[in-house]
């Protein structure tokens, strides 16, 4: 079972209710006669989302967890990193959005021309609005998996809700094996597509009505069949939140290894 949990604080990660001085007074100091390397190995077993708990043990634990070396070196060398899906969700216009992460447990829009840099020739190339690439490519409902660009198209223009762009042929094709019968009723402008450990994840609102507060999560595994045809297999469909305020919009959804 998966659920969407809010991360305390503002979008920049600060916790306005956190007072380190009060924490020091509330927690008794503990003297640990352990090498720092051993402490790192012990704490590395804790998932990143639970790091606030070990921090409260003592100052030594806090220093280890807050160090860049711990998360970027120690956890990677010990193969304890894992993908975590984060989403930035806004609830009303002109209000500050909040960060959420997916945990396993019981302004007016303007059109802008997209420019891309070709590193071999060292040239800038403009992708016009009428180009085939721009047909389904949207920043929120698109993502890259295995060097291929995938997009969510709930209008099913190619008869399937997920499409993939083949750069060598400059053409979009449907992801076979996934159709609307496998998905909940989703609202396109409230749904996002993300790469989660090599799989596609759709995170989206249940419908387009203002009274809807549900967020669905659909996990889809990808595989190649019959040459280069991409197929999808729906692994799970679940409601990850029922408690969000109405009229929420998912502004960003990305996976981070922690």
UniProtKB/Swiss-Prot annotation:
It comes from the Eukaryota. Residues 1-25 are annotated as: Disordered. Residues 28-74 form the F-box domain. Coiled coil: none annotated. SUPFAM superfamilies: F-box domain, Kelch motif. Residues 8-20 have a biased composition (Low complexity). PANTHER family: F-BOX DOMAIN-CONTAINING PROTEIN (PTHR24414:SF65), F-BOX/KELCH-REPEAT PROTEIN SKIP4 (PTHR24414). This is Probable F-box protein At2g29610. It comes from Arabidopsis thaliana (Mouse-ear cress).
């Amino acid at each position: 079972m998966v659920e969407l949990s809010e991360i305390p604080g503002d979008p920049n990660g600060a916790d306005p209710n956190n007072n380190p001085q009060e924490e020091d007074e509330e927690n008794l100091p503990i003297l640990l006669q352990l090498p720092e390397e051993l402490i790192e190995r012990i704490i590395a077993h804790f998932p990143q989302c639970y790091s606030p708990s070990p921090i409260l043990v003592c100052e030594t634990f806090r220093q280890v967890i807050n160090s860049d070396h711990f998360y970027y070196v120690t956890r990677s060398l010990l193969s304890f990193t894992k993908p975590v899906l984060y989403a930035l969700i806004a609830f009303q216009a002109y209000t500050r959005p909040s960060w959420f992460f997916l945990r396993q447990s019981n302004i007016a829009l303007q059109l802008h021309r997209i420019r891309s840099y070709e590193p071999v020739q060292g040239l800038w190339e403009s992708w016009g609005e009428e180009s085939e690439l721009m047909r389904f490519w949207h920043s929120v409902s698109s993502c890259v998996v295995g060097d291929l660009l995938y997009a969510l198209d709930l209008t099913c223009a190619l008869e399937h809700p997920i499409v993939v762009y083949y750069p060598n042929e400059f053409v979009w094709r449907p992801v076979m094996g996934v159709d609307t019968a496998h998905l909940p009723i989703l609202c396109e402008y409230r749904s996002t597509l993300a790469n989660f450990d090599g799989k596609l994840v759709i995170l989206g609102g249940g419908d387009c009505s203002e009274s809807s507060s549900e967020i669905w999560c659909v996990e889809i595994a990808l595989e190649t069949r019959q040459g280069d045809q991409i197929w999808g297999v729906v692994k799970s469909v679940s409601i990850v939140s029922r408690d969000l305020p109405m009229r929420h919009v998912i502004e960003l959804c990305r996976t981070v290894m922690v």
